[in-house]
């Protein structure tokens, strides 16, 4: 806590977990954050941007959901499922001390991976208009780690329609062009 300003705050944006002030943050870290990370938790720094009063980290974060993780999945019992996500942390520094930290991740991706959100379950009001919810699972962070690991634009039906038309146009133009060597 010595590395924090008098009234710091931390906000895990998707779940509104964290706290305001040293007392709340100490309780949050001691009871809900540090001990709640499963033993399988792995984190890898992917990039860091440093500004005059901010540090922004992009991280790979994974774990097997073998225990409750209150800061990420409040009140959700363990599912024994693997979770892989990208986390972004924005830390604001004032006078060399932590003023606030905002942590972002794709909560829909987490819920898909643990089986709490099924992309195929479209609300009645969207049936006939939408085949699946536009959410991804672990493939989203895998694409961050390796851009060739997953196809881009897989959820865009029109992308594939345009690609087929472009391929047909390319085939047509190839058939109608003369070689300069002729």
Predicted feature residues:
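C-terminal and inter-domain tail/linker signature
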Residues: 1-182
């Amino acid at each position: 806590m010595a590395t924090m300003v008098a009234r710091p705050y931390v906000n895990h944006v998707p779940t509104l977990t964290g706290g305001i002030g040293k007392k709340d943050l100490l309780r949050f870290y001691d009871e809900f954050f540090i001990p709640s990370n499963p033993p399988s938790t792995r984190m890898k720094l992917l990039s860091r941007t440093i500004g005059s009063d901010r540090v922004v980290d992009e991280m790979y974060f994974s774990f097997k959901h073998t225990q409750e993780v209150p800061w990420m999945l409040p009140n959700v019992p363990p599912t024994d499922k693997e979770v892989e996500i990208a986390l972004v942390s924005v830390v604001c520094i004032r006078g060399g001390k932590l003023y606030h930290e905002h942590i972002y991740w794709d909560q829909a991706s987490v819920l898909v991976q643990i089986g709490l959100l099924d992309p195929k379950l479209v609300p009645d009001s969207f049936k006939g208009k939408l085949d699946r919810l536009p959410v991804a699972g672990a493939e989203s962070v895998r694409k961050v780690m390796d851009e060739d690991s997953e196809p881009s634009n897989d959820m865009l039906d029109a992308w594939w329609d345009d690609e087929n038309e472009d391929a047909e146009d390319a085939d047509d133009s190839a058939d109608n062009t003369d070689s300069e060597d002729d």
